[in-house]
């Protein structure tokens, strides 16, 4: 049977083929997007908790009995808490350095800050360094080395900004690490302009593996503040229990990285099994309280329950 190109039946077959092709491409795209999310099916919830006094100094010597954990407003009973460790636990971190075109005048400063952070690593800690412009690239893999890779000194600022994709890639890399304390340190001066991933999905991916995000605003001190960019970096930090550092420069930026490294070395880590064992994939609100009212506590605000 030979069909004319212009026959109704031939046109119908072409239309059906086009629809099927579209569905196939859509399924592939959805699969790729699903692959961007780290799936964690463990029932163990890990909280990395920072405790400071009114002067901002880290508070050592607290016991598990000093902490109260609330999930969706309900206290976690002591028998469900399976782990508690203090400052000596190792951490794994990823430094994300923005190398997009707008970072041209700030790239050397960002590199200097990364060097300062690596210099504060303890022997048991590891860090990796990634850059992100129009694409995300690994500059150096996880190690306890305090030296920045020589290729970092040949970096140039160019291209768009893939901040969200960089956070997702960092979370995926950290998911394979055995350390319970995980952190992502972001140095950026602008909004995401080129990622496949949304900001919410990037935060969700970081929360899924228990990573704390520290957002360092690299906008020039003498330039206009980008309020949307600031809000994004603040959101990364606040929702994951990290800190936002506003537009530092020179020594202030290097000090900020020193302080972040010190904070990671002065956290408490608490692991527990939820009383609510429903595997519904829903968000559970988290709150940690401390027995001493003069102290301040910071940790992530939620986690997503496993599904299925």
Name the predicted role of every residue range:
Residues 1-10:
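N-terminal secretory signal peptides that target proteins for export/translocation
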Residues 9-12, 26, 180:
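Generic N-terminal leader/processing signal
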Residues 3, 27-30:
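Intrinsic low-complexity/disordered segments
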Residues 12-14, 47:
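Short amphipathic alpha-helical "recognition" segments used for binding
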Residues 29-308:
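Scaffold/interface architecture of coatomer-like assemblies
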Residues 14-26:
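Bacterial N-terminal signal peptides
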